[in-house]
């Protein structure tokens, strides 16, 4: 059984022990389910009450956290990041993939395959594809002709990469991701929707990770561009000619319409909808289920169906919840000061 002392774990993450440094830790868990011998972490204030109830032997917390519990703590700058390092000690070893080409894989003409590449069963690699050193191409992956794949990229099963795509180094694509499908472009002619040719490409830079069943459409011309370090969740739709700036993060079920650009370090929470041909400034945050229809300045935090500054959205929500009370007060005032004036024909809160 793998075990480490609290002191050893604190040394690994650069933390300070508060409590018993020699306690042996044999596993990891979340704060609600942790048992004796396990270590957990606290980064979200919502779970502070769980500290008093957890059975964990130790907790990784922030340096500023104030505790009245006798439980042993490891104080660090970032509990989540530190706990990620600890997880790696107790996690199973990652699977290794034997280099080579499975006999069921189909390899086209003039394909260039680097060193230590693993191509799994039933993968299809079309003509003139270039694959860098150390890549893993999962089962049933399709890579279209003239695409270029950077070294140490990892494509899980059933990834589709259409022709002429440009994929950087250390890119991770999860199952069902589709890169380079046609953009949604049509022109109405004589009452019919005529397809507009989509002749651009998709460029994905180094260290990008894209979740399961996410789709990135090729440019109408030019390119759809996901820049270095972006992390994109499952079930995201990225339309033609979108540009996503470095180190941006996009949560599930978000949709970005064509020719919109995001600056660097932008955060889009779940189910955000972004209109086309607008720009989201560097460092902006859009909260869940917001709809954005116009440019967003740098570092703005927007929220709501019609995305507004988040403080304004909160004020409007408070006022909205008070409308029934305000309506009753208004009726009483009207009755008091305008006793003979006609009343509204319908009460919007009881009709």
From Swiss-Prot:
GO CC, alphabetical: membrane
Pathway terms, separated by semicolons: Bacterial outer membrane biogenesis; LPS lipid A biosynthesis
SUPFAM superfamilies on file: Trimeric LpxA-like enzymes
Domain of life the protein comes from: Bacteria
Residues at the catalytic site: 240
Record carries keyword NADP: no
Record Pfam families: Hexapep, LpxD
EC number, UniProt record: 2.3.1.191
Reactions the enzyme catalyzes: a UDP-3-O-[(3R)-3-hydroxyacyl]-alpha-D-glucosamine + a (3R)-hydroxyacyl-[ACP] = a UDP-2-N,3-O-bis[(3R)-3-hydroxyacyl]-alpha-D-glucosamine + holo-[ACP] + H(+)
Keywords: Acyltransferase, Lipid A biosynthesis, Lipid biosynthesis, Lipid metabolism, Repeat, Transferase
A molecular function (GO) term: N-acyltransferase activity
UniProt similarity note: Belongs to the transferase hexapeptide repeat family. LpxD subfamily.
Subunit structure: Homotrimer.
Protein name per the record: UDP-3-O-acylglucosamine N-acyltransferase
Source organism per UniProt: Methylacidiphilum infernorum (isolate V4) (Methylokorus infernorum (strain V4))
Gene encoding the protein: lpxD
